[in-house]
């Protein structure tokens, strides 16, 4: 632990206690931006034997990076300064709340003595009220604490426990004097939530589920909450208990092995491929596991799921044909369903698959690029272990339709949908797992919002593949409204020159307009695993993927408005 001059600072402080707890929870890097109210605390991060500081270009990017890190590690931390810094990060923190990502937001604040004077301190609103931003945090975090010396340890443990259990951000206001206040190290590990399943609820759920299933084949639709709640093993056991056709929503893409013969594809309501839609909506018994239907992943709520034939497995409760059983945790409900399939002694026949079509030959090398061409070729370039981040535009919807190789992790942000998120999030993902190559897919307009972190990739010695889709502006917005409107235009950048300008010396950069040029660039990226590779892909303004075409239609197939 950091030790300083005993005359000026105690050997072990409240700040050290917080850092030790974060390290205990699996955090080894902390993102953020320095400010005068957090500088002394940052000294303790730098001196900590199990933690490393990763500074960012701005607080918004730091929040996005912490989000990307937290999705892979299960916990992350972000440090900003009071007022100006924390509000800059608020968009990212709100996104983590919406998408259930555990991020601890630590805000360095003025000393309690300075706050007590109620004077107009810098970074405040000048009215003597230093809790404005604490109150803001209540809307976008699951737990908050304004640390006081006497209760700091207990409050730190409370916030961290809530973040770990709820899988949402927490907020800790750490005043400069409280951060240096003396305390003792943790005596024991942070207590874990021991579970809240009612044996009676579990027994009744099992009985009802067994009656509904009978000898039917079940079909499973899974989504991201299975990942967030760390119930993937229980879900995989259910899929292995019989021949179980299964699909995911776009939000849960890569949750399951998409190379499995039983994997149906992506379900998106009326925007689904017809075979996927039929398999899900006409299943004799459908198990929905961790499913949250949002507008952009459900074809604007066009799903047609019959509750009478559905077993819905949620975070703390499950239902069978509309009858709710609670409290019942997801993992235990999935285990009960697995036991039902195992005990009944009925094996379902193999899933009928359409005959495999021979792969079409690659397009002519001189052919101008299309969206489909780009995502087809990107998918063939992926290898097990890759972490793919697709920004909320043509990149996300272009990739959603494609099956990923086994062992590839896919990250998007379809609920919060903050464009530019994925570039700093890719940094966080790469820091979380530097042994897994990160592949970033992002539009030109989105990249302009957060591109500063290219320099941080270089400083951290990371070697992502970055595909920038240059379609001359906000193509998704053009597809929705304002095809030729000036507000959907952006200033064109010379993308192949951007890495140099941001301090990336060891890199490759390509500008591609034909299939042959794209093929050559991705082949070079595969050869050069030790450096950043940026590929600028030039596409027509109004070239959009099939799935996005379906989603932006003004009406559903039944004629009802989508928005």
Curated annotation (Swiss-Prot):
Gene Ontology terms: biological process: aromatic amino acid family catabolic process to alcohol via Ehrlich pathway
Keywords: Decarboxylase, Lyase, Magnesium, Metal-binding, Thiamine pyrophosphate
Free-text cofactor note: Binds 1 metal ion per subunit. Binds 1 thiamine pyrophosphate per subunit.
Ligand binding (Mg(2+)): 444, 471, 473
Protein's UniProt keywords contain Magnesium: yes
CDD domains, per the entry: TPP_PDC_IPDC, TPP_PYR_PDC_IPDC_like
Gene3D superfamilies: 3.40.50.970, TPP-binding domain (3.40.50.1220)
GO cellular component, one term: cytosol
Alphabetized Pfam families for the sequence: TPP_enzyme_C (PF02775), TPP_enzyme_M (PF00205), TPP_enzyme_N (PF02776)
Binding locations of thiamine diphosphate: 59
Region (Disordered): 347-367
Enzyme Commission code(s) on record: 4.1.1.-
Positions with biased composition (Pro residues): 351-366
Region ranges (Thiamine pyrophosphate binding): 394-476
GO molecular function, a single term: pyruvate decarboxylase activity
Annotated protein name in UniProt: Alpha-keto-acid decarboxylase
Gene that produces this protein: kdc
């Amino acid at each position: 632990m950091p030790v300083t001059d005993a005359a000026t600072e105690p050997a072990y402080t409240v700040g050290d206690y917080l850092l030790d707890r974060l390290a205990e929870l699996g955090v080894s890097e902390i993102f953020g931006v320095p400010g005068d109210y957090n500088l002394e605390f940052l000294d303790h991060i730098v001196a900590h034997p199990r933690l490393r500081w990763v500074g960012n270009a701005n607080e918004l990017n730091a929040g996005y990076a912490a989000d990307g890190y937290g999705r892979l590690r299960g916990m992350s931390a972000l440090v900003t300064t009071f007022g100006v810094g924390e509000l800059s990060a608020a968009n990212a923190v709100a996104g983590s709340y919406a998408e259930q990502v555990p991020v601890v937001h630590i805000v360095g604040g003025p000393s309690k003595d300075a706050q007590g004077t109620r004077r107009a301190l810098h970074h405040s609103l000048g009215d003597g009220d230093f809790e404005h931003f604490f109150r803001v945090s209540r809307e976008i975090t699951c737990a908050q604490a304004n640390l006081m010396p006497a209760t700091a340890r207990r409050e730190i443990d409370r916030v961290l426990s809530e973040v770990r259990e709820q899988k949402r951000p927490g907020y800790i206001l750490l005043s400069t004097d409280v951060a240096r206040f003396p305390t003792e190290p943790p005596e024991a590990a942070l207590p874990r939530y021991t579970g809240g399943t009612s044996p009676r609820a579990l027994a009744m759920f099992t009985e009802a589920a067994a009656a509904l299933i009978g000898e039917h084949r079940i079909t499973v639709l899974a989504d991201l909450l299975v990942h967030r709640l760390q119930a993937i093993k229980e879900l995989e056991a259910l899929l292995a208990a019989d021949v179980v056709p299964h699909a995911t929503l776009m939000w849960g893409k890569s949750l399951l092995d998409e190379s499995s013969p039983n994997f149906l594809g992506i379900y998106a309501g009326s925007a689904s491929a017809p075979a996927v839609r039929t398999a899900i909506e006409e299943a004799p018994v459908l198990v929905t596991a961790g499913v949250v239907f949002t507008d952009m992943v459900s074809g604007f709520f066009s799903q047609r799921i019959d509750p009478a034939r559905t077993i819905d497995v949620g975070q703390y409760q499950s239902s069978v044909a509309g009858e709710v059983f609670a409290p019942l945790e997801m993992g235990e409900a999935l285990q009960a369903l697995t036991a039902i399939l195992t005990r009944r002694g009925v094996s379902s026949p193999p899933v009928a698959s359409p005959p495999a079509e021979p792969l079409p030959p690659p397009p002519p090398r001189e052919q101008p690029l299309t969206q489909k061409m780009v995502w087809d070729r990107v998918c063939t370039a992926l290898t097990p272990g890759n972490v793919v981040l697709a920004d909320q535009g043509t990149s996300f919807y272009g990739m959603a339709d494609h099956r990923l190789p086994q062992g590839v992790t896919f990250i998007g942000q379809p609920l919060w949908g903050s464009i530019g998120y994925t570039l700093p999030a890719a940094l966080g993902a790469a820091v979380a797992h530097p042994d897994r190559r990160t592949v970033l897919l992002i539009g030109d307009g989105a990249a302009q919002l957060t591109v500063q972190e290219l320099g941080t990739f270089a400083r951290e010695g990371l070697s992502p593949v970055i595909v920038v889709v240059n379609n001359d502006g906000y193509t998704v917005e053009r597809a929705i409204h304002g095809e030729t409107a000036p507000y959907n235009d952006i200033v064109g950048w010379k993308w192949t020159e951007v890495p140099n300008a941001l301090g990336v010396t060891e890199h490759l950069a390509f500008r591609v307009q034909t299939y042959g040029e794209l093929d050559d660039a991705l082949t070079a990226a595969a050869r050069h695993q030790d450096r950043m590779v940026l590929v600028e892909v030039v596409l027509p303004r109004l070239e959009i993927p099939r799935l996005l075409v379906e989603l932006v239609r003004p009406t559903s197939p039944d004629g009802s408005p989508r928005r």
